[in-house]
Amino acid sequence: MRSVIPVKTTLTVLTFAVLLLVPQGIPSLKNYMSIEPKSAIAVVTFPAKPAAAEALVDPLASPAGLSQTVNKRLLAKAPRNLSDPAHVLDHFYAALLRGEGVHIIHYGDSPTTADLITADARALFQHEFGDGGMGFVLMARPWAWYNHRGIEMSGSNWKIDVSSTSNSKDGLNGLGAVSFRGAPGAVSRWKVKTAHRSVELAYLVEPQGGTFVVEADGNPIGTGSSTAGAGERPFTPGYASFNIPPRTAEIGLKVTSGSVRFYGADFRKGAGVVYSSLGINGANVTLLSNAFNEAHWTAELRHYKPDLIIVNYGTNESGFPDFVDSTWGREMRKVVARLQRAMPEASILLMSPMDRGAKGVHGEIDTIPTMPRLVATESKIAADTGVAFFDTFEAMGGSGTMGRWYTSEPRLVGSDYIHPMPAGARIVGELLFSALREGFNQFKLEQLNQNIVRQADRTGQEASQQP
């Protein structure tokens, strides 16, 4: 009996099956898995007994029909509260798909300073795509609440300069916007909870710098100098990398002579996701638009090569209505322009602030009036400049969320109705990860759909040429 299924459709379905099943058997292709085989029936099963009104057209009777079906699923899986019409996140998604190494940097204010939100997003990304290491951390704690989950740090005898309240005013404070000037007697220590392969120290190259020694559990593993050497330009970032011996519990640094202006330490394991949390207490958008020296910041960004740059400001500014309405948008546009000049290939994501509550005259906790305006402004900036936008405000529940969070059990926000408790921060971190994970799934399905259509076209042409 002659098959009732057209040749092209048969070839297309077989191609789809190969694309679906091959990654299951070849570990190196695991990141190309879009759905489990047991779920494939939802995509390719023919209707058993369609109703008369629906039986006129078989949606899978041609490659074009199959393509339309897959595209409908893509639309259905579009990430919520994540807007990326220019597909700027495709660079980030492609890096995840390659499964080699992916670097995310996340600029923010107080919650990011404490590694709230970012720690939970980091854990989820590293669980899903591999743990590439702790990433960039500061030399010591500029504030008591500075934190990076998975590492304990301490330091002494440093002169600390923060870009947002800088005394030097030169804007040369490294990737994390904080520098640490030290002479002999200045020390830093980092205790990592899991083994890392290497640590790279960043500092300012100077005409007359200083020297330092790096130790693993008290034993020297290398030395470095911040004095400009042959081919090095003074007042540019410098880097010194050291391999970490197996089973090392603590990395230490000591300045041994002169004076060194350090920026931070970058801990790496290898392939996987690195998620660097770059929070500054009390920071606002002008940190990136004005306080950073642009050439210096560009050099730092190009060295660390982030695949995704998240800019997450607005909470502190939302308390100043005049600034929000007259200046904030202009400053954020400057930030985006700086980033696009520095890293034209990187994915850039503007992440809106969370809700911010205030107690009303009758004791109710309402969203402050400036917050929806600020979020709307940021959304428009993202659309105008061709970067992605994650609407944290709407994702967490929109207006009135902090009031609901404050009265929930357990309480999800502090008594200022601004700073999330760890459980609240976890929710936001999961929302961010979920949106990007859904975007990644959509990206994979789009790649799969394109492969199906291309393969169907090729096999159809071959079949038509057969005698």
Protein language model annotation of sequence segments:
Residues E294, D355-P467:
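Catalytic His-Asp segment of secreted/periplasmic serine-dependent ester chemistry enzymes
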Residues Y107-S110, S277-N281, V311-N316, M351-D355, ...:
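Active-site-proximal beta-strand/loop segments in catalytic clefts of secreted hydrolases
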Residues S28-R73:
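Juxtamembrane proline-rich low-complexity "stalk" or linker regions positioned immediately after a signal peptide
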Residues R80-L96, L288-R302, R330-R338, R373-V375, ...:
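Alpha-helical scaffolding within the catalytic cores
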Residues D115, A119, A123, A295, ...:
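Solvent-exposed, polar/charged alpha-helical surfaces in well-ordered, non-transmembrane soluble domains
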Residues T113-R330, H419:
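Conserved SGNH/GDSL esterase-like catalytic core that processes O-acyl groups on lipids
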Residues K305-S318, S326-R341, L349-F389:
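Conserved N-terminal glycine/acidic-rich loop preference
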